[in-house]
Regions:
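Alpha-solenoid helical repeat scaffolds
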Residues: 1-296
């Protein structure tokens, strides 16, 4: 009781001392759960994991304990262990779509996208009405270069949830990248922006569609708005450079590409999705410099 009071008052060090006395006298589940929560809140994932290993021994058939253990290992970047635990969970509850979904996300974090696709497909077989599963499967397929599969799954997500703004954005952007169905792409982006009018990435997609349609002035206006609503992003600066270059504003295009190049190199480990090629950016910069020199 004293330990619980300390916990509620966020006097965590005192609570830990009391909980350790409790488990020494009578080992059971609740103190270990609360100690793990304290350790996690203090950034001591190693100690939180230790508590959940004790819990797994106390209650080896508890799905909640197994899944939370997997979560902690994932946060501690021990993805192989997290994946193994989630695989065990699928054996315990083979008809639980949420577990297959969690396993797919773990595979994604471990850069095992092929296995992530298979797990996501299993989740969808068990729950074919979940729009987020279709969206995530579509994103995985796009990353693998399967644009047809990506488009099909994004459409399915929208069929289930017409207000799925991210799916509308994704579809519009894929169409723009391929340079086809640009009017349809525009429709999707307008729907996405009705739902999230200040989403910088949606505005970037809209700008890129205008650029592909040959309207660089409209494209520039959207990209400039996009930069207001996002953190510095190398893809947006690359797009900005391309648009400025098309408008023959070579000085500013060079500056935009330099920003993109710098962000790409300095944040290369943090860029999970699309990112510019540094050499391509350098080539663009050199081309713009030559044109600037020719104009003098």
């Amino acid at each position: 009781r004293i330990a619980a009071i300390y916990f509620e008052q966020t006097l965590y060090l005192r609570a830990l001392d009391e909980f350790q006395l409790v488990v020494a006298a009578n080992d059971h589940k609740d103190p270990h759960v609360l100690m793990a929560r304290i350790y996690e809140s203090q950034g001591r994932l190693d100690k939180a994991i230790e508590e959940f290993e004790i819990l797994r021994n106390l209650e080896p058939k508890s799905m909640d304990i197994l899944l939370y253990s997997a979560r902690l290992y994932s946060l501690d970047e021990k993805m192989d262990v997290a994946i193994k635990l989630l695989q065990n969970a699928t054996e315990m509850e083979p008809k639980n779509d949420q577990i297959y979904h969690s396993l797919a996300l773990a595979y994604m974090s471990n850069q095992e996208n092929g296995k992530a696709v298979e797990s996501m497909k299993k989740a969808l077989v068990l729950n074919p009405k979940k729009d987020s599963y279709y969206f995530e499967l579509g994103a995985l397929m796009e990353k693998a270069g399967d644009f047809k599969g990506a488009i099909e799954n994004m459409r399915q997500a929208i069929e289930i949830n017409p207000l799925h703004s991210n799916a509308h954005n994704f579809l519009g952007y894929i169409y723009a990248l391929e340079g086809r169905d640009l009017d349809r792409a525009l429709e999707h982006l307008k729907k996405a922006l009705i739902i999230q009018p200040r989403n910088g990435y949606f505005l970037d997609s809209l700008g890129w569609i205008y650029f592909k349609k040959g309207d660089s002035e409209k494209a520039l206006a959207q990209i400039q708005k996009a930069l207001i609503y996002t953190d510095p992003d190398p893809v947006l600066y690359d797009h900005l450079g391309d648009i400025l270059f098309s408008l023959k504003n070579y000085d500013e295009a060079t500056g935009a590409w330099k920003n993109s190049h710098s962000l790409t190199l300095h944040n290369k480990d943090d860029l999970g999705g699309e990112k510019p090629n540094p050499q391509t950016l350098q080539d663009k910069i050199e081309k713009a410099k030559k044109l600037i020199q020719q104009n003098y």
